[in-house]
Amino acid sequence: MTAQNIDGKAIAQSIRTQLKDKVTARKEAGKRVPGLAVILVGADPASQVYVGSKRKACEEVGFISRSYDLDSSTSEDALLSLIDECNEDPTIDGILVQLPLPEHIEESKVIERIRPDKDVDGFHPYNVGRLAQRIPVLRSCTPMGIMTLLKSTGVDTFGLDAVVVGASNIVGRPMSLELLLAGCTTTTCHRFTRNLEDKVRSADLVVVAVGKPGFIPGDWIKPGAIVIDVGINRLESGQLVGDVEFDVASQHASFITPVPGGVGPMTIASLLENTLYACEQYHD
């Protein structure tokens, strides 16, 4: 068996095209276009790349993109004040603060300062709580994008045994909630998990988000399983690889996401979807 690649790049492009059409329709109806404020603190190279991609995607679909590039020495109070300004700005529908933040700034304070109706990253406790209660509104972007990828396969997720490897607030935990909502029997694995291999081998669906190249050997994958690889790791050679041993895993799986071109593009597409949702549901 050779797995079918799930083409996140193509699916994300299709979403962006649909969003662009919706923005055009809003303009023609005399409505304002959605606005996204993107805040970057410091000059972390990876963060700069991510932020650049998000701003470019905004412009592509016709959103207003507000850029705030702050020095790494910016105080916590100054950042919170900027968030307050964006919260009160009626032209801004979504506020994104690029993580990680400098050590002197408390991430939880920043996330909780963003109004829940402008939390297009889906990290605010209100939005995570809504997902936990099975009534999601603004959803965490990477898990949301993964659910879109799963839907594209046509596979019925109800009753599947799913294993999520990684328990971060950004991916692992909300991913487990999304899969529960989609009818999976979900196991979340983390650094204290025993017998990880046994759990992965028994899974119909595996989502891996740990940030370690080749962390899951390909021969652990159950024949016919679906593999979602969230990891993006750069080797010394410059090659980008995921958290799963792709070449071997693709001989076992039915569907697999490549790295790059799998989950990554969907995170940004979901961010744009959330921004339009916030505009239409909360701010029109």
UniProtKB/Swiss-Prot annotation:
It comes from the Bacteria. It catalyses: (6R)-5,10-methylene-5,6,7,8-tetrahydrofolate + NADP(+) = (6R)-5,10-methenyltetrahydrofolate + NADPH; (6R)-5,10-methenyltetrahydrofolate + H2O = (6R)-10-formyltetrahydrofolate + H(+). GO terms for molecular function: methenyltetrahydrofolate cyclohydrolase activity; methylenetetrahydrofolate dehydrogenase (NADP+) activity. The keyword NADP applies. GO terms for cellular component: cytosol. Transmembrane segments: none annotated. InterPro entries: Aminoacid_DH-like_N_sf (IPR046346), NAD(P)-bd_dom_sf (IPR036291), THF_DH/CycHdrlase (IPR000672), THF_DH/CycHdrlase_cat_dom (IPR020630), THF_DH/CycHdrlase_CS (IPR020867), THF_DH/CycHdrlase_NAD-bd_dom (IPR020631). GO terms for biological process: L-histidine biosynthetic process; methionine biosynthetic process; purine nucleotide biosynthetic process; tetrahydrofolate interconversion. Belongs to the tetrahydrofolate dehydrogenase/cyclohydrolase family. This is Bifunctional protein FolD. It comes from Shewanella pealeana (strain ATCC 700345 / ANG-SQ1).
